[in-house]
Amino acid sequence: MVQGCLCWRGCCDLKTSFPWVTNSRRLWMNCIGCNPVWRLRAWGCLAGGTTLMVIWLFWLLRSVPGGAPAPQPTLTILIWHWPFTNRSPELSSDTCTRYGMASCHLSANRSLLASADAVVFHHRELQTRHSRLPLDQRPHGQPWVWATMESPSNTHGLRHFRGIFNWVLSYRRDSDIFVPYGRLEPFSGPTPPLPAKSRMAAWVVSNFQERQQRAKLYRQLAPHLKVDVFGRASGRPLCPNCLLPTVARYRFYLSFENSQHRDYITEKFWRNALAAGAVPVVLGPPRTTYEAFVPPDAFIHVDDFSSARELAVFLVSMNESRYRGFFAWRDRLRVRLLNDWRERFCTICARYPYLPRSQVYEDLESWFQA
């Protein structure tokens, strides 16, 4: 094969290019630049190489940071029971977009069971209404989500749901879909003023049972600390818009959980205390659990004291400088309440790509009670 042709257009001067060759036709047939067959093959190779180069560049642009993201298919999350009500709220197509999660559609339309990407069952309705799960209509491989924000002490009947659910949505940090009651977020605006304090301690409680640890602790505190009790249990209920301004007048708020369980930190801490501007005195999981969510100097844990009397003395004798130190976090952080079930369910879409499809909770009761 002759590759020394001086002209690539098929009109080379063979005698000039190769004066030592006497058979010009043989030379022409073997010249890549002159033979039309070889020219077509060469141009074909060039075109193929160019196509491969374009494909490679397109892949590279999509794979590097800042490249055009691949469009994500819209996920449909079916809510079988809307929590605590027979009617779901309005669920528009952009519901999850409001919470920063695109390509996610929530629906309470049970006719979508066959096509939904995941189905959510809230335990309270399973527990109180004895609703029948649509096991005979379940599509093969469809993930089912068990959801609750209640403590194990108030969650019953889990033995009936062995080997059914794939994922768990709850306040537990080891849940597949972790949804706390609240969190602290970075905040760069001006520090909000601390409400004026005129009273010592407040407690809002609706379900007061003497057998509960919080009731026992309150009985021990009461002789040493002035605590104003609100809620149905005391006959002094507060309207929804009255709770925060009422608690804001108090220096401390008793954030006593109704039961003490792993990661169980509810609105009694996030809303009733932190959002209201009172220092939370907490009874719940260990101090280390609270410190996973907030700075260690943002709350007072009852476990840090040997007795209720010692705790009361600490609260009553606290000077103003020490008291204001519990609000240092407000200079850079703010409370974000996560009490909207729509946002909680939208979180499923954010976690969906990372969750194992083949996982099954064979003993949901043992896992949740642990």
Curated annotation (Swiss-Prot):
InterPro entries per UniProt: Glyco_tran_10_C, Glyco_tran_10_N, Glyco_trans_10, GT10-like_C_sf
Lineage of the organism: Eukaryota, Metazoa, Chordata, Craniata, Vertebrata
Chain segments annotated as transmembrane: 37-59
Name of encoding gene: Fut7
Single GO MF annotation: fucosyltransferase activity
GO cellular component terms attached to this protein's record: Golgi cisterna membrane; trans-Golgi network
Record topological domains on the Cytoplasmic side: 1-36
Source organism of this protein record: Rattus norvegicus
Protein name: Alpha-(1,3)-fucosyltransferase 7
Activity control summary: Inhibited by NaCl. Inhibited by GDP in a concentration dependent manner, with an IC(50) value of 93 uM. Also inhibited by GMP and GTP. Inhibited by N-ethylmaleimide. Activated by poly(ethylene glycol) by enhancing the thermal stability of FUT7. Activated by Mn2+, Ca2+, and Mg2+. Both panosialin A and B inhibit activity with IC(50) values of 4.8 and 5.3 ug/ml, respectively. Inhibited by gallic acid (GA) and (-)-epigallocatechin gallate (EGCG) in a time-dependent and irreversible manner with IC(50) values of 60 and 700 nM, respectively.
Pathway: Protein modification; protein glycosylation
Coiled coil listed as a keyword: no
Stretches in topological domain Lumenal: 60-370
Annotated S-S bridges: C96-C104, C239-C242, C346-C349
